[in-house]
Regions:
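Hydrophobic residue at the +6 position relative to the catalytic HRD Asp in the kinase catalytic loop
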Residues: 283-287
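Catalytic-loop of the protein kinase fold
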Residues: 275-282
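Protein kinase catalytic-loop region centered on the HRD/HxD motif
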Residues: 266-275
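Short helix-adjacent coil turns
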Residues: 322-323
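Short amphipathic alpha-helical recognition elements used for nucleic-acid or partner binding
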Residues: 313-314
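Broad phosphate/nucleotide-binding scaffolds in NTP-utilizing and phosphate-metabolizing enzymes
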Residues: 1-267, 289-292, 300-302, 306, ...
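Short adenine-binding "F-helix/F-box" segment of the Bergerat
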Residues: 309
């Protein structure tokens, strides 16, 4: 579909959604409070269904944009049914014909396919909203995968994101300050711009490979620069089982090793190197029989400022140590708490304690009987969403997406370890780098 056609379709959806909310506003004038709430929840669910249906028909960039926006919806007060519908925006697409992919590879790499590779499998290993992946063999016999960007997605990302932002704001789904909403969407735009530039992903791969080269529990594929451009990325092929198969067939020891490694590596990268793999989708991991993990897809990576990481870590550690006043001071520094207010602080403290359930100290089984963090977070989020003195700084958009993704995977692997000790050890590196100490 042309850019004009995409904008027309999204514009029509915006008009319909906005009109539905305006109609409910008028009807609400004569409804009781409970009837208004019930009608608005019903409308959120209907409009989430419309959004999913329209993005599904547009495919490509619109699907990827929709997934990114769906994580912002997690920060606002909409019913669970609407969240569930938005959660159906999977990063999958229909395969692009091999003839089209072959021509794109040859145009990007500047030569006939037969001279560039010993072989390339015409059947894709996978097709996502932004690109398609094929197994291949280099002339020297090295097994690789070749990732090819879909035609036109670079141009569609910005326009689709702008149209969706307009839809959500006009429809009053995102009832937050303009400053906060603008910051969220700037963050999403920045990450999506990077995802459609494979030179950026190649640099990310090299950064993570350098940092993790001596880690015994994970492996990062090597980039083959001679076969890589902005639209084609060639990297070492890793082997292993996808998460569902590993959960079913992996030994308890292997699942324990993998689960602890996922969490440990995440916190080591964040606190020690101020970088995270920001797309912890289950499909971005391959699990070996002994629990070693192959990390895939480095298009979505987030780097952080040292001072910001230091303040965020202080919030986490002070919450873990039950030092509320010190935690609030750092929340103000982060911009998460805009002013000292009793109700906002109570709500933020409950949220922080819920997020921190696995980190309070001693052995803890993620996904075990004592793990009710997910339920406690879900209970407090509606209050967080409507409190104007609480904000989600743009840094949190992908940080908490990544943290939530790791937690979700580990609820299936069920590792048992002292997560509190892991973050204390990792955060000590931040303190050394920033030259601070914690107050007791």
């Amino acid at each position: 579909m042309s850019k004009l056609g995409r904008l027309a379709k999204l514009g029509s959806l915006t008009t319909r959604v906005t009109g539905s909310y305006l109609g409910q506003q008028l009807a609400g004038l004569v409804q009781s409070e409970s009837a208004r709430k019930e009608a608005l929840d019903r409308l959120h669910i209907e409009n989430a269904g419309r959004l999913v249906a329209n993005l599904g028909s547009l495919k490509g960039a619109a699907m990827k944009v929709g997934q990114a926006v769906a994580q912002v919806i997690d920060t606002v007060d909409v019913p669970p049914e609407a969240r569930a519908l938005l959660g159906t925006l999977h990063d999958k697409a229909e395969p692009v014909p091999w003839e089209v992919v072959r021509a794109r590879i040859e145009a990007e790499l500047g030569g006939p396919l037969d001279t560039l590779f010993r072989s390339v499998d015409p059947s894709p290993l996978g097709t996502a909203s932004l690109g398609q992946v094929h197994a291949a063999v280099l002339p020297d016999g090295t097994e690789v995968v070749v990732k090819v960007l879909h035609q036109g997605v670079e141009d569609a990302v910005a326009s689709d994101l702008g149209a969706l932002k307009n839809l959500l704001v006009s429809g009053r789904v995102l009832r937050r300050s303009k400053e906060e909403i603008d910051a969220w969407f700037q963050e999403i735009q920045a990450r999506l711009d990077e995802e459609v530039d494979y030179e950026v992903e190649a640099r990310n791969l090299e950064d993570f490979r350098r940092v993790l080269q001596n880690d015994p529990d994970v492996v990062v594929p090597r980039v083959h620069r001679g076969w890589t451009t902005r639209r084609v990325l060639t990297m070492e092929r890793l082997h292993g089982k996808p998460l569902p198969a590993f959960v079913q067939t992996g030994s308890p020891e292997a699942k324990q090793r993998a689960g602890v490694a996922l969490g440990r590596v995440f916190f080591d990268l964040y606190y020690g190197h101020r970088m995270i793999h920001a797309d912890p989708h289950p499909g971005n991991y391959l699990f070996q029989a002994d629990g070693k993990i192959g990390l895939l897809d480095f298009g979505c990576v987030r780097y952080f400022d040292l001072e910001w990481v230091a303040d965020y870590g202080a919030c986490a550690i002070y919450t873990r140590r039950d030092q509320r006043e010190l935690m609030m001071r750092h929340a103000v520094r982060l911009g998460a708490l805009t002013e000292r207010d009793a109700d906002a602080e109570d709500t933020l403290w409950i949220l922080g304690r819920a997020i921190g359930i696995p980190f309070r100290g001693g052995p803890f089984t993620t996904g075990g009987p004592e793990d009710d963090a997910h339920e406690q977070i879900a209970r407090i989020m509606p209050k967080v969403a409507v409190n104007p003195k609480l904000r989600a700084p743009r840094e949190l958009v992908f940080l908490h997406r990544a943290l939530g993704g790791i937690y979700s995977i580990n609820r299936q692997l069920k590792p048992r370890t002292d997560w509190g000790e892991i973050i204390e050890t990792a955060y000590a590196r931040t303190l050394r780098d920033v030259g601070r100490t914690l107050q007791e």
